[in-house]
A protein has these predicted regions:
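Histidine-rich, glycine-flanked metal-binding segment
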Residues: 1-7, 12-59
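Divalent metal-coordination and catalytic microenvironments
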Residues: 11, 31, 54, 65, ...
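Divalent-metal coordination cores built from histidine and acidic residues
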Residues: 52, 56, 72-165, 192, ...
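Metallo-beta-lactamase
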Residues: 60-67
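Active-site beta-loop-alpha junctions enriched in small/polar residues
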Residues: 67-69, 90-91, 115-119, 169-171, ...
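Histidine/acidic-residue-rich catalytic or RNA/ligand-binding cores of hydrolases
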Residues: 74, 95, 175-178, 203-220, ...
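Polyanionic/metal-chelating signatures
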Residues: 102, 106, 118, 125-130, ...
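Divalent metal-binding pocket/active-site signature
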Residues: 146, 155-216
């Protein structure tokens, strides 16, 4: 019998693609899985052997929404089984620089979106911030500014951005037309739109802030108009009373031919920066 380079023994193998959830031996040859075998009666042997009794063996997890994009966080994620960490919500206005900083330095895979928020900040504000708190949040873009914002997004996709990222709750002054135009660019590059919607709660907040249902209707309409794929960046904990309604809206949109996904974070509360537009007057 051929000696394997690596034998992972007795682990609970979970593979969503094949619907496998069972105790198995896994053999690796030349860096690739060469055999998966039931443990009973197995005679597999490896040059290196790992006893994974009581542990789960699975494909690496892909985290679509990871703001911890530094070496320390990558190491922690690797220990949690994450093999790819992507910053697809906020993203960056300079894809080349973002990738250059991490090249050949990380223990896991990484990727970034061409971000609407940082594009707005780069065009409309002086200096850098993760979340806008001045003009990029609270002022409509002038014609020339909008042209530059959209060009920044387009260049980011040309340079390897994996998606177009939006944080609409953080840029309440961004017009519906501005967002539709950015969706059009995503469609042009066959890139998905990863969108933190304008409002998360229900019923709608006081003033001009939208609730979760109205906000999801907006981005689904954008996807319908442009044909862009859409990922709704979480069904939020502050909209628990309408969670079933939101999921039904997404499901029915997909049944009608759209390409929409969503997720939720595994906590009962969210977090953000106190200077963000979420805490504008009337936020309570």
């Amino acid at each position: 019998m051929q000696m394997l380079d690596l034998l992972i023994k007795n682990g609970r193998v979970i593979d969503p693609e094949s619907h496998t959830d069972a105790q198995r031996h896994i053999g690796v040859t030349n860096g690739k899985i060469s055999v998966i075998e039931e443990i009973w009666g197995s005679k597999l042997q490896g040059i290196q052997e790992i006893d994974a009794t009581g542990l789960i063996v699975s494909p690496g997890f892909i985290d679509l929404h990871s703001h911890g994009q530094d070496i320390e966080n990558y190491r922690i994620q690797a220990m949690d089984g994450v093999t790819t960490a992507l910053e697809l919500e906020i993203g960056t206005a300079d894809v080349d620089e973002w990738y250059d900083i991490r090249k050949n330095k990380t223990p896991i895979n990484y990727g970034v979106s061409s971000g609407h928020i940082p594009a707005r900040i780069s065009v409309m504000e002086v200096g850098f911030s993760l979340i806008p708190s001045k003009d990029a949040a609270h002022r409509s873009a002038k014609e020339a500014e909008l042209k530059n914002i959209l060009e920044t997004i387009r260049v980011g996709l040309k340079r390897g951005g994996l998606a177009v990222g939006f944080g609409l709750q953080y840029t309440p002054a961004a017009s519906r037309i501005e967002i539709i135009e950015a969706f059009k660019i995503a469609k042009e590059f066959s890139a998905p739109c990863h969108v933190h919607i304008r409002g998360m709660g229900n019923p709608p907040d006081k003033g001009n802030k939208l609730g979760a249902i109205e906000s999801i209707q907006e981005v689904i309409a954008n996807a319908t108009i442009t044909g862009a794929a859409l990922h709704i960046v979480h069904i939020s904990s502050v909209g628990l009373s309408v969670t079933e309604d939101l999921l039904e809206i997404v499901e029915n949109a997909n049944l009608n031919g759209l390409d929409i996904t969503t997720e939720c974070y595994p906590y009962s509360a969210g977090m953000t920066l106190i200077e963000s537009a979420i805490f504008d007057e009337g936020w309570q």
